[in-house]
Amino acid sequence: MSFESPPSITTSLHNTLLHISQNPYPYIPNPPNCPRRASVALVLRIRPSRNDLPPTAPQIFPYPEPPTDQRLANFFEQSWVKNGDPELLFIKRAAREGDRWTSHVALPGGKRDPGDASDKDVAVRETSEEIGLDLRGERCVYVGNLPERVVSTSWGSVPIMVLCPFLFIWICPAFPPLQLQPAEIASTHWVPLRVLLSPSVRTYEYVNVSDRFAKQGGVVVKTILKPIIGKMRFSAIRLRPSESLYCSSTKEYFSEESQPKKSIFERAYTWFKGGEKAQSDRPLLLWGLTLGMVADFLDQLPPHDSVELWEYPTFTSPDIRIIINLLTRNIKKRNTERLRGSAHDGTGNQTAMDGETTAVAMLESGGPLIGKNKTKEHAVGVMLEGYYDAMKKGVWIGAGIRLMSTLALILWLVRWYRLRSNRGR
């Protein structure tokens, strides 16, 4: 009996890119009263092995350029590519007050301007403006798109934009030096795909979401709920870059003398918590919207289980977590079965969520089928369908139980003190 060895990651990557290029995902129109669109670029490259260096002269394609499948075939047939290490480019956004995604690990990209001809042009323009990388020309191949997502806030109820991811691969051995935009980008990081696919780097991000409840009940409710519900826990990947570039003018890495000094009470509170890490000392965590889009891509690579990178968000307080699990048990079971049935039919990973927003991959209903990723089905939040309402209900039930328990304890202590005082007379 003979056993075939599994394909290398570069061979799997070639097959995946070929599939994506031949099976585009559909265009998603904006929901009513939601005119904004944004695009991001997933940029791949192959890092050569020390034992198989590329030729000094780059491969030049004749003009006009061959079709995408031929360009990919010519690129992946080279020895240094077969033995190389595929990597994906990430950015860390600069710290900006009032920015929903301040200091987040993300993909290069931004919102669409009136002068942009297409969503793809937005990704190309923003990548050039943010990190100085030109994705046009013979040194880079545009592969295709990934599922577009409707990004919503207020726990999935208010759409704010349509997010469009596009995939590119750099096919030249030499990579140009990046020029980071200090006002927007703190650093860039190349992370091997084998690291992103490894279970050992999976972790969690913890976010304070009491501000969400403040909108419903005011500052008093926020102050009461903050110690009661704890922090919200999200799935994450701890990035281990092979190469990083830092923008030396950003305040994440160099403190400013003009920053106001903390009061003695603030310093005492920081000391009580065990100190406060600088931005540069914090781990690079991939989570939220960016994790959802990256999981869409990684799930098409062996072992095709990157959707498991995502877990249902929950809270750190054990009792509230138990209540949420009880309320959402049947919902999660139902949605997981639906996702398994559509994981590779073009529906993709349906979930991406961070502390403030949710991104749901959507597909057009009806219309002609063009390739495998065109589907008749209108998929709207397979994994998160019904979960938000149950989770919010669980939070309020848990908070109510804690408050009633606290009041009961206070009443018991008062009664006990009065009885003890009466006995002493």
PLM-predicted stretches and their roles:
Residues 1-125, 129, 133-163, 167-177, ...:
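N-terminal leader/linker segments that precede catalytic domains of diphosphate-processing enzymes
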Residues 180-208, 280:
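NUDIX/MutT-family hydrolases
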